[in-house]
Amino acid sequence: MSPQTETKTSVGFKAGVKDYKLTYYTPYYETKATDILAAFRVTPQPGVPPEEAGAAVAAESSTGTWTTVWTDGLTSLDRYKGRCYHIERVFGEKDQYIAYVAYPLDLFEEGSVTNMFTSIVGNVFGFKALRALRLEDLRIPPAYTKTFKGPPHGIQVERDKLNKYGRPLLGCTIKPKLGLSAKNYGRAVYECLRGGLDFTKDDENVNSQPFMRWRDRFLFCAEAIYKSQAETGEIKGHYLNATAGTCEEMLRRAYFAKELGVPIIMHDYLTGGFTANTSLAHFCRENGLLLHIHRAMHAVIDRQKNHGIHFRVLAKALRLSGGDHIHAGTVVGKLEGEREITLGFVDLLRDNFVEKDRSRGIYFTQDWVSLPGVLPVASGGIHVWHMPALTDIFGDDSVLQFGGGTLGHPWGNAPGAVANRVALEACVQARNEGLDLAQDGNSIIRQASNWSPELAAACEVWKEIQFNFKSVDTLDLNEIK
C-alpha cells in the first residue's frame, strides 16, 4: 500500500460523489453572533429537492466541491463549512425558495469586500443544479463590520463641512453627459451652482475622453465652484469623477482634485471594483475629500427578481467599502425602485441599527456599530412636481439630484436651479409647519410658483411628465402584510 493510500485510509477517506445535503444542510444549527448570514432566492432545476439546492449553495460558496476529496481529512470541515440552516417556500412563485446560509467568520479576510463577495457569490451562480440564484440579503456581524473603515466621513461630518442643515441637499448631473468641451462644461456647472444648487455632477461615463480630458475638466469645474461660492456665500461642490483604467491613475486624479481644494470627488464603484473603491475611500478619509458613489452597472446585477444580487446587498457592501453618497433610486422617477424596498435599503445606508422587516425586504437585523452612514441620492427622471414626494420619502438626510429637471428649464440652467431650490425650500417650510407633503404637495408647489417665475415656468414644462411603469423588483406575497 502506497503512503498516499495509507493517508487516505487513516482519515476515513472514501472516494465518490455524495449528496450535499448530507453535510451542508443542517436545519438544527443555531447561528452564532459572529456568523455572516445570507438569504438566497433559489430556483432549483426540475427534480432537485430544495434541501439539496440550498446545501449545494452553502457547499459551493464555502468548503465544498463536486466530489469527496481526501484533503477534507486534513482540516476541520465542521469549523469552516457554510451551513444551509433554513429553507422557506416563496408564495406566489413557482419552484422558488429562500435558503438561509450561515458562514463562519474565519472564511473571510478582514476589511475586504472583494474577498467576501468572491467567497459568497464568486462561483456558485453558475452551478448547473440551479436554474437561477439571487442573493437577497446579508447579515454582516459587528465582529466583521469593525474590520472596515467604511464611509470616509459620513452624514454629520459632511453637513458640518458644507454648513448645510435642516433640508435635503440639491444636485444636478450635467447634460449632455458626453460631448461638451471642458470650458462649456465648466460654464454649465457654474450656472447651476450660482442658481442655488449645492452640487453638480459628472455623469458616470465622463472619465477622460478626447473631447474633454480629465485635467481640463477638473480645472474649469474648480473655477466654477470658487466663482459661484464667492457670489452666493454658500459652499459648493462638483462630483469630479476620478474613475480610471487603473488604480494608480484613479488616485492621481484624486490627488489633483485635492490639490485644487475642491470638497468632493466621485467613483463608479461597481465598474471600478471594490478594491479600487476601498483604496479611494481610504485616500478621501486621509485627505479630507467627500466621496460620491455612482452605481453604474447595478441593474445588470440586481434588476431581475430571480437571479443576481439585490441592491440592498450592494448598498451594504458600499457602506463597508466606503462612500459618502450613493445613488438609490427615486421611487417616483424614471428608474427602478419600489417604495417599501427602496426605503428599506435607504435605512440600511443611513441608520446605525435596522431591525428585520420583511415588509420592506430586510431579512436580517443589521447592527452597523459605529460605522458612519451614507447619504442616499435620488436621481433619474425627477422634476419640480416630484419635490414634495421626494422630500417626504427621503427626508433631510438625502441628496435630490435633478439633471434634465434642471438643465431642461426653458430659460436655462440657472433658472432651472432656482426653480428647484425654491420648490425645495417651499416643501421644507410646509413640512415644518405641519402640512402633509403627500396630500398637499401640488398646492404647495403652485403657491410657491406664484412668487417665483422660474418655478412657474418649470411647472408648466413638466406638468404632464410621468413614468407610470411597475417595478420589476417587488415584494413577495409572504412579505406583504
Curated annotation (Swiss-Prot):
Q: Which residues carry this modification: N6,N6,N6-trimethyllysine?
A: K14
Q: Give me the gene this protein comes from.
A: rbcL
Q: Which residues form the propeptide?
A: 1-2
Organismal lineage: Eukaryota, Viridiplantae, Streptophyta, Embryophyta, Tracheophyta
**Where is this protein primarily located?**
plastid
N-acetylproline modification, residue list: P3
Which modifications occur after translation, per UniProt? The disulfide bond which can form in the large chain dimeric partners within the hexadecamer appears to be associated with oxidative stress and protein turnover.
Task: Cite the record's note on assembly.
Answer: Heterohexadecamer of 8 large chains and 8 small chains; disulfide-linked. The disulfide link is formed within the large subunit homodimers.
Remarks, miscellaneous: The basic functional RuBisCO is composed of a large chain homodimer in a 'head-to-tail' conformation. In form I RuBisCO this homodimer is arranged in a barrel-like tetramer with the small subunits forming a tetrameric 'cap' on each end of the 'barrel'.
Q: Which residues carry this modification: N6-carboxylysine?
A: K201
The catalytic activity, as recorded, is: 2 (2R)-3-phosphoglycerate + 2 H(+) = D-ribulose 1,5-bisphosphate + CO2 + H2O; D-ribulose 1,5-bisphosphate + O2 = 2-phosphoglycolate + (2R)-3-phosphoglycerate + 2 H(+)
Source taxon at top rank = Eukaryota
* Residues marked Transition state stabilizer (site): K334
Sorted alphabetically, the keyword list is: Acetylation, Calvin cycle, Carbon dioxide fixation, Disulfide bond, Lyase, Magnesium, Metal-binding, Methylation, Monooxygenase, Oxidoreductase, Photorespiration, Photosynthesis, Plastid
Q: What is the protein name stated in its UniProt record?
A: Ribulose bisphosphate carboxylase large chain
Its subcellular locations are: Plastid
